[in-house]
């Protein structure tokens, strides 16, 4: 009888999880399809938004197409990339809805903090990159190609597809860099790695920065050097912030232990929660 009860509970939990996965997958697919068609419908406006840093240069600036299918490929690529950025919050929310019901109250608070931190870093880095980094990069590249004499005339007329891909790569590098401090803080908070492990193994972090820069950046040595430097700098800043947070938490924990609040809290710990989702 006990075996039948355990088998029934297992089948019920498995059916519940599979049903929840099906619901979340349907929502993601619907959002993905609607977002892609919407981005393709407004693909010209999206391309203009990405091309705005180049179009604001002081001289006559315009793009060229050298192939018959280049314009269509640019529209499709821009729509797909913009769709991936716009649908990312929906995918994150559906994953959050799937995982959060099985957590305790303290775990929910902790995971919500990581979720908000990840989203804030993502949009902050994206905004700073598009509003400050990309215009300065194109301003530098434009005036590097300018000539100071009349004996040699060089006029920059970039291909629209190459320009969009390079701009998207810069934005993607910033998106990857934005999640580095979140990952470091998450590992330290969940005790997956200690702060001493990070500080004593900085050479491995440098290898990680080189590997990430080589994997996610275009095959250009200067782009990889800049990406490696940015990732290393962000990791060091995250370790510094985590060190400050750890010192504050140790002081708070010692104060709570002296007052006896931690022992009282451990005695009144809540019972385990069952997996049940009411999020839609």
Curated annotation (Swiss-Prot):
Biological processes annotated in GO: intracellular protein transmembrane transport; protein transport by the Tat complex
Region (Disordered): 258-280
Keywords, comma-separated and alphabetical: Membrane, Mitochondrion, Transmembrane, Transmembrane helix
Highest taxon of the lineage: Eukaryota
GO MF assignments: proton motive force dependent protein transmembrane transporter activity
Pfam short name (any one): TatC
Family, similarity comment: Belongs to the TatC family.
The name this protein goes by in its record: Uncharacterized tatC-like protein ymf16
Gene: YMF16
């Amino acid at each position: 009888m006990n075996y039948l009860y355990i088998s029934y509970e297992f089948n019920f939990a498995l059916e519940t999880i599979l049903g929840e996965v099906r619901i979340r997958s349907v929502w993601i697919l619907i959002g993905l399809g609607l977002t892609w068609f919407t981005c393709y419908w407004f693909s010209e406006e999206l391309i203009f938004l990405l091309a705005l840093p180049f179009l604001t240069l002081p001289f006559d600036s315009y793009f060229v197409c050298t192939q018959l299918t280049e314009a269509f490929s640019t529209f499709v690529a821009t729509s797909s990339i913009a769709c991936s950025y716009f649908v990312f919050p929906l995918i994150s929310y559906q994953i959050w809805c799937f995982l959060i019901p099985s957590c305790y109250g303290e775990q929910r608070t902790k995971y919500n903090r990581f979720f908000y931190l990840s989203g804030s870093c993502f949009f902050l880095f994206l905004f700073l990159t598009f509003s400050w980094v990309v215009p300065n990069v194109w301003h530098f590249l434009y005036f590097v190609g300018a000539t100071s004499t009349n004996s040699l005339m060089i006029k920059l007329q970039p291909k629209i597809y190459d320009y969009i891909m390079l701009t998207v790569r810069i934005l993607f590098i910033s998106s990857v860099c934005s999640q580095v401090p979140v990952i470091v803080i998450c590992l330290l908070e969940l005790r997956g790695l200690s702060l001493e492990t990070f500080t004593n193994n900085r050479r491995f972090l440098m290898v990680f920065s080189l590997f990430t820069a080589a994997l996610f950046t275009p095959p250009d040595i200067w782009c990889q050097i800049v990406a490696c430097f940015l990732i290393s700098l962000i990791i060091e800043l995250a370790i510094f912030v985590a060190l400050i947070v750890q010192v504050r938490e140790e002081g708070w924990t010692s104060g709570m232990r002296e007052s006896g609040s931690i022992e009282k809290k451990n005695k009144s710990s809540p019972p385990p929660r069952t997996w049940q989702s009411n999020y839609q």
